[in-house]
Amino acid sequence: MYLKDSKTVVIKIGSSLIINESKSIREKWLSDFALDIQNLQKLKKNVIIVSSGAIALGCKKLRLNKKNLKLDKSQAVASIGQIELMNLFKKNFNSKKINLSQILLTLEDTEQRRRAINAKRTFDNLFELNFVPIVNENDSIATSEIKYGDNDRLASRVAQILNADCLILLSDVDGLYTKNPKIHKDGKLIKEIKNIDAKIEQVASKSIGMHGTGGMKTKIDAAKICQLSGSYMAIANGLLERPIKNIYQKNNCTWFLPKISKLDARKKWIISSISPKGKLIVDDGAINALKKGKSLLAAGIINIEGKFSKGDHIKIIDRNLNEFARGLSSFNSNEISKIKGQHSNRINEILGYVTKSEVVHKDDMVEI
């Protein structure tokens, strides 16, 4: 039902849907999946496909074992495999008159505000031209320190910057179960999840498929981003024939419901950051002020963790080390180390130059 009401839909495909355990291409599956995308376009929906598989296909072409690859070698393999991946899509989608484009993203493209806006503009223009973007992480240049790490989180960030109505993660299971169904026969599918609590975290499977880099844990991480961005997210079985049609007709999947009905685009971007650069631990007085919609001042800061620059994403933590909010810092970490615990009227004196008094302005902050 959530899919039917969605205008912009992001669909993530795992490597295991492209290439099976015997390293054979799932040509029939791709052809059927193209019919699903064709149907969504007929319903006037904007569709984005986030597809894994570049490294797996590169390994297949070069006859390499993915598990033995080091980062620098995997980057080269990814550049080879990305061509193979796009050729597969082109072969199966062009016959159904589906126009395709390719977008390769790095972490900074969604984490830096200006680049995120530019990326959204590109996507919007592609929708106007009736093209379906195929998105992947730019593994050939991304380093381990600046990677999404898996395409589940990449897909959730793409959904977030596009203000997409829903994200569908196609996997090799029907959704999230009360127990791992591959081990426990009494495991039951959870149809809807409103809150990702400790129990949900616990039941999330940590199993990893032969070709993928993620598991159920990364899908839960993606769901958290979607919930805080106002988007619906589904985990569904992609191995079924016509998986999107199956969601439409049977809704046999797990839906994560958004926590936030509406946030402006700027605050969505702030709250959904994958990699905040630091933490500010604040006192009870500061927490009470923030609850009333006030800005964070230096006087309420007890401690600081991490090194960051002005404008970077940071977490605001209470005395019990619980995350209360996220925001954009008005100061760098060195400056905050000097002014923490001080009254605002002393900041200019301490730093030796005139600056603002708010460490995190209320307009640059979102409560978790």
Feature-to-residue mapping (PLM):
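C-terminal catalytic "cap/lid" subdomain
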Residues: M1-K66, L71-N99, I103-I368
